[in-house]
Amino acid sequence: ALFTQLATGLEFVADRRIGRPLGTFDKPRPDLAEGIASGRALANITLSLKALRDLALRLDPDSAKTQAAFDHAIGLSETLNDPLLDHITDPQAWLKLEILQQAIRATRDTAIAEIGPALGVELGFNSQDGD
C-alpha cells in the first residue's frame, strides 16, 4: 500500500499540481494552479516532492537511483521563481515547468523499477485508476 501511495503521489504532483495549470503550450492555465490565494502553488509541489522522497527513503534506504531522481526534481522545483505558477504564460517559463513535470514522471518510473523489486512488490491498484 505504501509503495502504491509513493507512485500515486508522484503521479498526482505531475498530473494535477503541474499538469492542470500547465495546460498546453498554446493555452497554459495558471488559473488552475493549486493554492493561488495562499501563494503556495510551487511550495506545495516542492514540499510534496520532499515528503515523497522521505517515504521512498524509508521504503528502501538503498535506492540510490530513486534518490538521485528525487534530488534532481526537487532541485528543478527550487530553481523556479514562480510561486503562483502565473509566469507560465511565458514560453520559457512554461518549458521549465514542463521539464519539472517530466523529471517527476521519470522519478516515478525510477522508483517503480528500483523500489518495487527491492520490496518484492508490484504497483497495486489505486482509486485514480478508474474502473
Predicted regions and their residues:
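Mature extracytoplasmic or organellar-lumen-exposed domains after removal of signal/transit peptides
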Residues: A1-D131
